A protein has these predicted regions:
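Active-site-proximal mixed secondary-structure blocks
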Residues: 1-33, 37-125
Length: 125
């Protein structure tokens, strides 16, 4: 089979879908992000890609914090829901039956049902 040459694009995949929690304890939000990964180990750096027109973009930009929650198979439907609807109009934690858990180093909540959560501070936009 001959090697194919394609134009530059977003062709790498599949990428892990994660549920990103943001906002405040009083007004928490969740968005599902597939564009995420590790940038560096020392110092530890990760990234997420969120379009500026998304509701969560403003929340993250304003607070400078978010929590990256690894999504188990049991939360597939919740992850799908959180990727399809805006948190500007509904509380996704309530709609999906998820539990906001207070952050340790950030003010935004994590998702208690997720097996691992990475509390993050924005260093570059």
């Amino acid at each position: 089979m001959a090697k194919q040459h394609w134009k530059g694009s977003t062709l790498l995949g599949p990428l892990p879908a994660v549920m990103v929690s943001c906002g405040t304890p009083e007004h928490p939000n969740i968005l599902t992000v597939a564009w995420t990964g590790i940038l560096n180990t020392q110092p530890p750096r990760t990234y997420i890609a969120v379009r500026p027109e998304r509701y969560s973009y403003g929340l993250i930009r304003e607070s400078g914090e978010f929590t990256l929650n690894l999504t188990p198979e049991s939360l597939t439907r919740a992850a799908d829901f959180c990727g399809m609807y805006t948190g500007a109009k509904i509380n996704k934690f309530e709609k999906c039956g998820l539990t906001p858990e207070a952050g340790v180093a950030v003010s935004c909540p994590s998702i208690a049902e997720c097996p691992m959560s990475l509390e993050c501070r924005v260093t570059q936009v």
